[in-house]
C-alpha cells in the first residue's frame, strides 16, 4: 500500500471518502470535552487529596484519570480540525494529538484490567490484600506507562507518510506508510492479543470469579457487603471495557485487512470503513465513563463530592445573605 490512505479495495468499492466522519468526530468531541474535563479534573483532585491511600486500586484510578485528561486536553485541536478541515499547526503537534488518542485507549485498558484483577484477587485472598504495599501499585503503573507509551509509537509513525511540515491534513486524513504485509499482520496480531484479547479474558474471569464468590460463605473479617462492592467494581470495569473498546478492536482487524486489500468484498469493505469512525468515538467515551466508575467504586469518593458540594452551597448562601444584609 502506498503512502496515501486509500487502498485498491476502497477505490474499487467507491468508499474512498466518508464525509459524515468530520461532523461525527466534531460532535462527539464537543460532547465529551467540557463534561470530561470537569469530571476528570474533579476526580483527580478528589482522588489525590481526599481518598485514603489504603483504598484498593487508588493508584490505578489516579493513573486512569491522568490518561483521560491527556486525551481530553487534545480535543480542542481535534474539534478545530474536523470543523475547519484544515490544520494550521506544526506536524509534530498533529502527531502528538494522534498519539495521545491511542495512549489513552491502551493505558485505560490496562489500568481497568489492573483495577478489576486486583479487586478480584484481594476478594479471594484477603490476607494478601493486607500485606500489599502501595509501592507495588506505583511500580506496576510505571511499567504500564513505559510499555504502553512505547507500544503506541507505531501509530503516529505509520501515519506519518508524506506529511510535510506545512501540510493542512491531520487525524483521519493522515496517510499510511507502506509496510511489508507479514510485518503488519504480526504487529496487528500482537496488538490485538496484548491490548484486547488478554485484558478482556482477564476481566471476564475476574467478573466470573467475583460472582461465584458471592455463593460461598464469607471469609473471616470479610462481609457480604465487601463482596458486593467488589462485584460492582468489576462489573463497572467490564461495562466500560465492552462499551468503549470492544467495538474498535473487533473492527480494527477488518479495517487493517481492508487497508491492505486482503478483504475486497464491497459490502464488507463499506461496512468496515463506515463503522471505523463510530468505533473511535466510542473509544473516546471512556473519558466520560471513567469518572462514573470512580463514583460507584469508592464510597469515600462519593462522600467527598457530597461534602464539597455542600460546602460550596453553604458558602454561596452565606455570600448571598451577607450581600442582602449590606443592601438592607
From Swiss-Prot:
Extracellular side: 1-27, 78-91, 159-182, 255-277
Keyword terms of this UniProt record: Cell membrane, Disulfide bond, G-protein coupled receptor, Glycoprotein, Membrane, Receptor, Transducer, Transmembrane, Transmembrane helix
Glycosylation (residues): 4, 14
Record GO cellular component, one term: plasma membrane
Gene Ontology molecular-function annotations: G protein-coupled receptor activity
Transmembrane intervals: 28-48, 57-77, 92-112, 138-158, 183-203, 234-254, 278-298
Cytoplasmic side: 49-56, 113-137, 204-233, 299-328
SS bonds (residue pairs): 94-170
Family, as annotated: Belongs to the G-protein coupled receptor 1 family.
Function summary: Putative receptor for purines coupled to G-proteins.
Name under which the protein is recorded: Putative P2Y purinoceptor 10
Organism: Mus musculus
Amino acid at each position: 500500500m502506498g503512502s496515501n490512505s486509500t487502498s485498491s479495495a476502497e477505490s474499487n468499492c467507491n468508499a474512498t471518502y466518508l464525509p459524515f466522519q468530520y461532523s461525527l468526530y466534531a460532535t462527539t468531541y464537543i460532547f465529551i470535552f467540557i463534561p470530561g474535563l470537569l469530571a476528570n479534573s474533579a476526580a483527580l483532585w478528589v482522588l489525590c487529596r481526599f481518598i485514603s491511600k489504603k483504598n484498593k486500586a487508588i493508584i490505578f484510578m489516579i493513573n486512569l484519570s491522568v490518561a483521560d485528561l491527556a486525551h481530553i486536553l487534545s480535543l480542542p485541536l481535534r474539534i478545530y480540525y474536523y470543523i475547519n478541515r484544515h490544520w494550521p499547526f506544526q506536524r509534530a503537534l498533529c502527531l502528538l494529538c494522534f498519539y495521545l488518542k491511542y495512549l489513552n485507549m491502551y493505558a485505560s485498558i490496562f489500568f481497568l484490567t489492573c483495577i478489576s484483577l486486583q479487586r478480584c484477587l484481594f476478594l479471594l485472598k484477603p490476607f494478601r490484600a493486607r500485606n500489599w504495599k502501595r509501592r507495588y501499585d506505583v511500580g506496576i503503573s510505571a511499567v504500564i506507562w513505559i510499555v504502553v507509551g512505547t507500544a503506541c509509537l507505531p501509530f503516529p509513525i505509520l501515519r506519518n507518510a508524506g506529511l510535510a511540515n506545512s501540510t493542512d491534513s491531520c487525524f483521519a486524513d493522515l496517510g499510511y506508510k507502506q509496510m511489508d504485509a507479514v510485518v503488519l499482520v504480526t504487529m496487528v496480531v500482537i496488538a490485538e492479543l496484548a491490548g484486547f484479547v488478554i485484558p478482556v479474558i482477564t476481566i471476564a474471569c475476574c467478573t466470573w470469579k467475583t460472582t461465584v464468590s458471592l455463593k460461598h460463605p464469607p471469609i473471616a473479617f470479610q462481609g457480604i457487603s465487601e463482596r458486593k462492592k467488589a462485584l460492582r467494581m468489576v462489573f463497572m470495569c467490564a461495562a466500560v471495557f465492552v462499551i468503549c473498546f470492544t467495538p474498535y478492536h473487533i473492527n480494527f482487524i477488518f479495517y487493517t485487512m481492508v487497508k491492505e486489500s486482503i478483504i475486497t468484498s464491497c459490502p464488507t469493505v463499506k461496512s468496515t470503513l463506515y463503522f471505523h469512525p463510530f468505533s473511535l468515538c466510542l473509544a473516546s467515551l471512556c473519558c466520560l465513563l471513567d469518572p462514573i466508575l470512580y463514583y460507584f467504586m469508592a464510597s469515600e469518593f462519593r462522600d467527598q463530592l457530597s461534602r464539597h458540594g455542600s460546602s460550596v452551597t453553604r458558602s454561596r448562601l452565606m455570600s448571598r445573605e451577607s450581600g442582602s444584609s449590606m443592601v438592607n
